[in-house]
Amino acid sequence: MAGLVPVPVSSAAATTSAPLAPVVLPKTSESEQLLKIRHSMSHVMAMAVQKLFPNAQVTIGPWTETGFYYDFDNPEPFTEDDLKAIKKEMGKIIGRKLPLERIEVSRDEAETRIKAQNEPYKLEILERLQEPITLYTLGDQWWDLCAGPHVENTKELHPKAFELESVAGAYWRGDETKAQLQRIYGTAWETPEQLAEHKRRKVEALRRDHRRLGKDLELFSIEDEAGAGLVFWHPRGARMRLLIEDFWRQAHFEGGYELLYTPHVADISLWKTSGHLDFYAESMFGPMQVDEREYQLKPMNCPFHVLTYASKLRSYRELPIRWAELGTVYRYERPGVMHGLMRVRGFTQDDAHVFCLPDQISDEILRILDLTERILSTFDFNHYEINLSTRPEKSIGSEAVWELATKGLTEALERKGWNFKIDEGGGAFYGPKIDLKIEDAIGRMWQCSTIQLDFNLPERFGLDYVAADGSKQQPIMIHRAIFGSLERFFGIMTENYAGDFPFWLAPEQIRLLPVTDDVQPYAEQVLNQLKTAGIRATIDQSGDRLGKIIRTGEQMKIPVLAVIGAKEAEQNAISLRSRRDGDLGVTSVDALLKAAQRANAERQPGLGLNP
């Protein structure tokens, strides 16, 4: 699939400084009516496109979590003016109050209909469809192969509650060797008020875009000369990453984990044993020849932890074993899907694996849930959406083991007191899992943490332990990631904070602003005191006027700006301006040191000083 190529669409955008309106935006996955509205709106759009552009051929057009899209094969690129015309035509179609009717047809009848319209993409879709074959008509002039569901009549679609948002390139079937299509994205809601709120949030999302903030705040970059999807951490971003990693390590040591460091490459035979070459080869970088052996970059850390476990004979008395690693992995991502820090080719997973006894599952899962909550809440993620995925039709492992594992996950979630949904049959073939999504400041949900039981790798590698009766038994293996990808989590976190990082996490916590050269020696004295106390502080050396250096500090989102003039130097004090708390007035250096050290130790968002 090709990357997004936004085409701006005129709309009355709300200012980003205004607070988000208290309008609850439903999700497609939670509202059957909204799903029908969006699915039907995609058909209305396709009908409008084919009326205005008779040579355009339709392919697929599903609903999404926030709207809908349709892929078209059209000789000419769609422009902003085209989108306006399409939207206008859609309004006319809605106003005609056309019925949407489901019709069941034979394969031959469907093929006859498609050939009459000369729609080769539909013929290819038809080849893959299982009977019964259904199509939906829109009035008596337009139809498409579709399983539904849809609204009964276009009068259920509000003419002022939809928008066409952008055009992107997309390959047919997501295959770069096939035809390149044009994907028109739209959004549709039940009311105009919901649409207005959606637009407001989109503007806010642009303000928070981690790619822009990463550049403006000098945190990271992706350099074309090095290659796509490879992250360069700049000093300010690297400082933040170190703080995150140090906290992560501390939390894991306190949670009973030991740390591992494992290689970045392995002999290709390891990936054969693990099954990655059978099931994951397309996402792996190709092999490299070294000393007549083939090696490949690791796409996952799991097999390395398995080998570490297998390096010696284990006893049931050792279990549970908890190992964690911040391990860099490498995965091939197509050019069109890479996106800032969210989708990259080299990234760090906060992987952990727990090897335990069957009767330890519930307790170990609960420990993981507690640790997950501790870590995520430290970064102000406190609202979660949790799914428990159970055994699919095709799976490995006995019914008894699956039942025991699923029961352990369920019990742990219930003991934790968290609400969760059950995705029947949604687990991996090798074990049930818990997926946790986090909600950010503007209501978006992000897939983050995963807890996955694995019956596959222990079997493939022949893992065992000596049980109390002297027999050898296979341990239960739990995969677990809290951040998922450290890079991706950093991007989500940056957007959640809009670059206004809490004091403890900010790469530069305090910037000293000497008003004149005469107070420079005093400013340097204060700087030394701050640095000695472990505070990340700098002095503005630009020589610009006070107003400009304050604006520069605000643009860099420095949590605390400390103005130093002759009065402050005489009083052994400083004047503080906090991004969170405003003007804090004149404060002694000693009070600042104590407040800053306390904020760092307790990982607080601000200094805690009163104006």
From Swiss-Prot:
Q: Which cofactor does it need?
A: Zn(2+)
Indicate the principal place this protein occupies in or around the cell.
cytoplasm
GO cellular component terms listed in the entry, alphabetical order: cytoplasm
Oligomeric and partner information = Homodimer.
User: Catalysed reaction(s)?
Assistant: tRNA(Thr) + L-threonine + ATP = L-threonyl-tRNA(Thr) + AMP + diphosphate + H(+)
| Disulfide cross-links | none
Q: What name appears for this protein in its UniProt entry? A: Threonine--tRNA ligase
Name of the gene: thrS
Q: What class of enzyme is it?
A: ligase
SMART domains, A to Z: tRNA_SAD
InterPro entries for the chain: aa-tRNA-synt_IIb, aa-tRNA-synth_II, aa-tRNA-synth_II/BPL/LPL, Anticodon-bd, Anticodon-bd_dom_sf, Thr-tRNA-ligase_IIa, Thr/Ala-tRNA-synth_IIc_edit, ThrRS_anticodon
**Residue positions binding Zn(2+):** 302, 353, 479
Task: List locations, semicolon-separated.
Answer: Cytoplasm
Q: Which UniProt keywords apply?
A: Aminoacyl-tRNA synthetase, ATP-binding, Cytoplasm, Ligase, Metal-binding, Nucleotide-binding, Protein biosynthesis, RNA-binding, tRNA-binding, Zinc
Q: Could you list the residue ranges that cross the membrane?
A: none
GO BP terms: threonyl-tRNA aminoacylation
Q: Which family does it belong to?
A: Belongs to the class-II aminoacyl-tRNA synthetase family.
**E.C. number:** 6.1.1.3
What's one GO MF term for it? tRNA binding
